[in-house]
């Protein structure tokens, strides 16, 4: 009996020692890879899967296709609702946006490259003036060693790559910020909790927190009315903000739990443990629910590999993972507890609108998990294509044009060239891309040949792979990225070390997160990404 007690106290002492000395992630991503501490951290270059197109002597890509807005008008114009073939919900595209806001951000530089508007454009040049443009500022880039290969090369032989302003790991920086200073500003600094505002409709993120920079691209409301969260784009739409809210509530629930179970822990220890559990929750939802819904399946974890670079690829963030923009429907839907559809909010009025949460997150969450999203294809709703962040002529933009312009700015090669470099067979005819005659006709009207197609357009136009909601090209890019994201993360939740650290986390499905962080939510299907 005495031996058993001694053994117990030895094991307990070891566990306490491990717990107290535990290394947690940095906020910047730095130090994750011990061999290359900067790898995957903030303000480091994207990597490439394919060689970019050539740039001219002025530093601009050699483009012979029509301007981006002209392509947008031919290809992306959506007139009718086209429901998801896979019966996916609006929550699916919201999680995708939340996820990419954790992994990548291309910040602009002062160098402008305006998007030419076709004369007599219905929205942006109705008076047929013929000299209208839309603002586009080129992505910030940095000089890199030419021996890394697959980089943009200028006329002087110097090599450049666009900068990822976020850490590339799935590390919760979307909630906690990508610096210790921002995170401290968002913390209550008491009991390991995050700052929240108590309201009649539940706890919501705080507003106007000093030292926490937030975007306000629409300028519909003063910036001091916007919510403060860890990623500056958090107010882009209320669906995105609702996911922030749920996970912040869950963080504080965990903090209260750990403070109760471990009275010897200080605020910092409780906070870091709660943060680690929320990161695990985000990773688990992404790999157990989101990726199988996107790709049909995803292989099991095989362990950490320090030789794998988890940095985001340019093709992933600039091209393939922008498929989500075609999923967005014309309204933010709200539902009551008994399933009654409430007054919806048009997307064009949802941008950076803090009042969209005045009824709480519950009506919006119900809408996200009930409503079927738009199909993933070449079509994009008018509120994104003509009214992004404002009215045409009053600051409004075209998201499809911006995506195309960014692909060209980053030197993403044409569709067939990209396919070849990815090891895929190049297409010969329009019907090799899609079996849909209407999409074939739009491609023919926009491009001279299949070799001219912009990769963003070609990838969206493809027939979906069986069991997946995307075509072959985007499938490969997305699969490749998320394989590296997981394999190259020393703090991945499935490593033996992190399983020990997070043994009290009790992570669950996304459906269970919703149930425990909302009030009177009603029925929540097991897979909230599918109807």
Curated annotation (Swiss-Prot):
Q: InterPro entries of this UniProt entry?
A: Haem_peroxidase_animal, Haem_peroxidase_sf, Haem_peroxidase_sf_animal
Q: Name one GO cellular component term.
A: extracellular region
Is Transit peptide set as a keyword in this record?
A: no
Q: Which UniProt keyword terms apply here?
A: Glycoprotein, Hydrogen peroxide, Oxidoreductase, Peroxidase, Secreted, Signal
> GO MF annotations for this entry?
heme binding; iodide peroxidase activity; lactoperoxidase activity; peroxidase activity; thiocyanate peroxidase activity
Highest taxon above the source species:
Eukaryota
EC number(s): the record gives 1.11.1.7
Where does the record locate the signal sequence feature? 1-21
What glycosylation sites does the entry record?
62, 131, 338
| Cell compartment(s), UniProt | Secreted
EC category: oxidoreductase
Quote any Pfam family the record assigns: An_peroxidase
- Induction remarks: Induced by srfA, during development. Down-regulated in grlA null-cells at 16 hours of starvation.
**Single Gene Ontology BP term?**
defense response to bacterium
Do you know which CDD domains this protein is assigned to? Answer: peroxinectin_like_bacterial
| Annotated site (Transition state stabilizer) | 233
Q: Active site at which residues?
A: 101
Entry's Gene3D superfamilies? Haem peroxidase domain superfamily, animal type
The reaction(s) this protein catalyses: 2 a phenolic donor + H2O2 = 2 a phenolic radical donor + 2 H2O
The family note in this entry says: Belongs to the peroxidase family.
The protein's name is Peroxinectin A
Q: Which organism is it from?
A: Dictyostelium discoideum
């Amino acid at each position: 009996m005495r031996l058993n007690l001694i053994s117990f106290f030895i094991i307990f002492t070891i566990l306490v020692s491990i717990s107290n000395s535990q290394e947690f992630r940095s906020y910047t991503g730095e130090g994750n890879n011990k061999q290359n501490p900067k790898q995957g951290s903030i303000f480091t270059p994207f990597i490439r899967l394919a060689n970019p197109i050539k740039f001219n002597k002025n530093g601009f890509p050699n483009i012979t296709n029509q301007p981006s807005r002209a392509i947008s008008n031919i290809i992306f114009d959506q007139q009718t609702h086209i429901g998801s073939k896979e019966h996916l919900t609006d929550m699916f595209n919201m999680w995708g946006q939340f996820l990419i806001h954790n992994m990548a951000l291309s910040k602009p530089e002062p160098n402008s490259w305006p998007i030419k508007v076709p004369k007599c454009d219905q929205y942006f040049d109705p008076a047929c003036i013929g000299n209208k443009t839309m603002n586009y500022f080129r992505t910030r880039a940095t000089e890199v060693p030419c021996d890394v290969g697959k980089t943009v090369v200028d006329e002087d032989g110097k090599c450049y790559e666009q900068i990822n302003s976020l850490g590339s790991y799935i590390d919760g920086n979307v909630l906690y910020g990508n610096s210790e200073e921002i995170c401290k500003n968002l913390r209550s600094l008491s009991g390991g909790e995050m700052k929240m505002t108590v309201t009649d409709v539940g706890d919501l993120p705080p507003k106007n927190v000093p030292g926490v920079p937030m975007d306000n691209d629409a300028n519909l409301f003063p910036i001091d009315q916007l919510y403060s969260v860890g990623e500056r784009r958090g107010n882009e739409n209320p669906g995105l903000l609702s996911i922030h809210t749920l996970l912040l509530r869950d963080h504080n629930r965990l903090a209260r739990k750990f403070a109760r179970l471990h009275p010897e822990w200080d605020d910092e220890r409780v906070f870091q443990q709660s943060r680690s559990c929320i990161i695990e929750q985000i990773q688990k939802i992404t790999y157990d629910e989101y990726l199988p819904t996107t790709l049909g399946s995803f292989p099991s974890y095989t362990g950490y590999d320090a030789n794998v670079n988890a940095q985001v690829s340019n093709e992933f963030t600039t091209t393939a993972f922008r498929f989500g923009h075609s999923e967005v429907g014309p309204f933010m839907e709200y539902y009551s507890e008994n399933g009654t559809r409430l007054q919806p909010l048009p997307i064009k009025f949802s941008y950076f609108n803090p009042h969209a949460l005045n009824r709480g997150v519950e009506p919006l969450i119900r809408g996200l998990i009930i409503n079927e999203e738009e199909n993933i294809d070449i079509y994009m709703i008018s509120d994104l294509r003509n009214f992004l962040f404002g009215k045409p002529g009053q600051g409004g933009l075209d998201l499809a044009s911006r995506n195309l312009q960014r692909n060209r700015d980053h030197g993403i090669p044409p569709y067939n060239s990209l396919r070849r470099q990815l090891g895929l067979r190049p297409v010969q005819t329009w019907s090799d891309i899609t079996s849909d005659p209407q999409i074939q006709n739009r491609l023919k009207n926009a491009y001279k040949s299949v070799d001219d197609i912009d990769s963003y357009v070609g990838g969206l136009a493809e027939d979906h792979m069986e069991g997946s909601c995307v075509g072959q090209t985007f499938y490969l890019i997305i699969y490749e990225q998320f394989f590296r994201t997981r394999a190259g993360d020393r703090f991945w939740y499935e490593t033996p070390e992190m399983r020990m650290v997070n043994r009290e986390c009790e992570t669950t499905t996304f459906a269970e997160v919703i149930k425990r962080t909302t009030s009177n939510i009603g029925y929540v299907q097991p897979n909230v990404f599918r109807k």
